[in-house]
Each structure stands twice: as structure tokens, then as C-alpha cells.
């Protein structure tokens, strides 16, 4: 069984460039076994062979492998710190901001960023790049259609100003859409941005091995300009941030030295 799974992850890496060894094995293996059994394959070899001949199966695998749990203003108090403290600090240094929402899932995070940033400066003076490994999820983010539940933390004035309701949910405004550029990107394999003022990567690194986390912290640090800030999730505190050329600014916010 172990050899079967190890063979599978090697084949996936060769075919897609995605290294499943960098994810926590217990969680990833459980997720993939459930998907394989759902499609009635007895082992990973037969499942991989089927995937190579069926794009639908491969896309389903990629979607299942990624973590697509998101909502607007998730962990609201942290976003308040970004709004009230971090962004004013960044704007003391420059008047145009380059922002990267890494592993953006269905788009709630970059649209949250746009709603906050427009309070401080015209959106034409902001570059927001939003990336994810999952093409289907990015397409969903570009459409910008959301359920009532995912909007529950949005302040009323922002909800009324930037969303249009229909019978089943809400469409995000064109103003916010135009402020965000979506792009496919693999955190574990692709080249990172440079000279970012703010990088947001939240509730993603918990799924990676410690080795992968260390590599990503180094790469995020290199992607920031001096004085730029990395904003991580509420379970992702960086211990020994100085190893990565970072210092704690506020809780879960790290400034590049």
C-alpha cells in the first residue's frame, strides 16, 4: 500500500509538477484515498492510469488536493489590524501599493483586500495579484458570485456598496473585479513576485510539512521589499522570524527588515 501511494505521488510530480511530499502526509493521503474510492479504484496505480486518460478525473483530483475554504473578512479582528495599522504604515512610505494574495481560493481574500484598500487610496493606485494552483477555482473567483454565508462578516456599508443581490446569492461589483488580477500559480514550484508591499497567505501553510514551510517563508521574505509585510493565518505564527529576515510587526503580521 505504501509503495503504491509513493509511486502515485512520484507520477503526479512528474506529470503536474506538484510535489505531494511537501504536504502533510496523513491529511493528504486520507483525502486522496477518499477520492480514489469514490471513483471505485482499488489502488493508486489504476487511479493514476485513469487520470492520464480522463481530464475530468485529473481536474477533480487537482480540486480535491487544494484547500478551498474561504470567506470575506475571515478572522475579522486581524483584518481590522490590517485596515487600522498596517496599511497606514505602508502608505507613509509610498503612495502606490503592490499586493499579492497567495493561494487566494475562490476570491474572497483579494476582494476583501480591495474593499479595505479603497478606504485609504484610489484602487487605480493599487496592484492586487491573486494566485492559486486551481484553475477552476480561479475561474469561480473571476465570476465573483457568493452565498449569503460567505458575506456574513462584511460590514453593512461595504456589502451595500460592493455587492448586488439576486435570488440565490451576491455578485461582487465590477469596481472590485477590475482591481484584482487572477493568475494560476503553484507556491511550491513557481517563481515568486518581487518588491511586494504586502503579501497575504492565510490558512494555507498549516497543510505543508515543516520543511516546505521554511522554504516558503524564505521565498515570501525575498518577494517583499524592505519594509513590506507578510500577513499569515491565525494558526500560522512564525517562530524565529528573524531567520527569514522578518520581524513581528503585529500578531500574525511580519515586516521585512
From Swiss-Prot:
**Chain positions recorded as S-adenosyl-L-methionine binding sites:** 68, 70, 74, 109, 132, 186-187, 202-203
**Which stretches make up the CheR-type methyltransferase domain?**
1-257
Record keywords, A-Z: Methyltransferase, S-adenosyl-L-methionine, Transferase
Task: Please list the reactions this protein catalyses.
Answer: L-glutamyl-[protein] + S-adenosyl-L-methionine = [protein]-L-glutamate 5-O-methyl ester + S-adenosyl-L-homocysteine
State a single Pfam family of this protein: CheR
Task: List its EC numbers.
Answer: 2.1.1.80
GO biological process assignments: methylation
Q: Which InterPro entries match?
A: Bact_Chemotaxis_MeTrfase, CheR_C, CheR_MeTrfase, CheR_N, CheR_N_sf, SAM-dependent_MTases_sf
Instruction: Say yes or no: keyword Transferase present.
Output: yes
This molecule's function is given as: Methylation of the membrane-bound methyl-accepting chemotaxis proteins (MCP) to form gamma-glutamyl methyl ester residues in MCP.
Fetch the PANTHER family from UniProt: CHEMOTAXIS PROTEIN METHYLTRANSFERASE (PTHR24422:SF19)
- Give the protein's recorded name: Chemotaxis protein methyltransferase
Q: Which organism is it from?
A: Halalkalibacterium halodurans (strain ATCC BAA-125 / DSM 18197 / FERM 7344 / JCM 9153 / C-125) (Bacillus halodurans)
Amino acid at each position: 500500500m505504501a509503495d503504491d501511494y509513493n509511486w502515485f505521488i512520484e507520477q503526479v510530480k512528474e506529470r503536474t509538477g506538484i510535489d505531494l511530499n511537501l504536504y502533510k502526509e496523513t491529511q493528504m493521503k486520507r483525502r486522496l484515498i477518499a477520492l480514489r474510492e469514490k471513483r471505485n479504484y482499488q489502488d493508486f496505480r489504476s487511479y493514476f492510469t485513469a487520470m492520464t486518460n480522463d481530464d475530468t478525473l485529473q481536474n477533480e483530483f487537482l480540486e480535491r488536493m487544494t484547500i478551498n475554504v474561504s470567506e470575506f473578512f475571515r478572522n475579522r479582528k486581524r483584518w481590522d489590524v490590517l485596515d487600522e495599522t498596517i496599511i497606514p504604515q505602508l502608505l507613509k512610505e509610498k503612495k502606490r501599493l503592490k499586493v499579492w494574495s497567495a493561494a487566494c481560493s475562490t476570491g474572497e481574500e483579494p476582494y476583501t483586500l480591495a474593499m479595505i484598500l479603497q478606504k485609504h487610496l484610489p484602487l487605480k493606485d493599487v496592484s492586487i495579484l491573486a494566485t492559486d494552483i486551481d484553475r477552476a477555482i480561479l475561474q469561480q473567483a473571476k465570476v465573483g458570485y457568493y452565498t449569503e454565508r460567505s458575506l456574513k462578516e462584511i460590514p453593512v456599508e461595504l456589502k451595500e456598496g460592493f455587492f448586488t443581490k439576486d435570488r440565490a446569492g451576491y455578485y461582487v461589483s465590477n469596481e472590485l473585479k477590475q482591481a484584482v488580477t487572477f493568475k494560476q500559480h503553484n507556491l511550491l514550484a513557481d517563481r515568486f513576485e518581487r518588491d511586494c508591499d504586502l503579501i497575504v497567505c492565510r490558512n494555507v501553510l498549516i497543510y505543508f510539512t515543516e520543511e516546505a514551510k521554511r522554504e516558503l517563508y524564505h521565498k515570501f521574505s525575498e518577494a517583499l521589499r524592505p519594509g513590506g509585510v507578510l500577513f499569515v493565518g491565525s494558526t500560522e505564527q512564525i517562530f524565529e522570524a528573524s531567520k527569514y529576515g522578518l520581524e513581528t510587526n503585529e500578531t500574525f503580521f511580519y515586516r521585512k527588515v
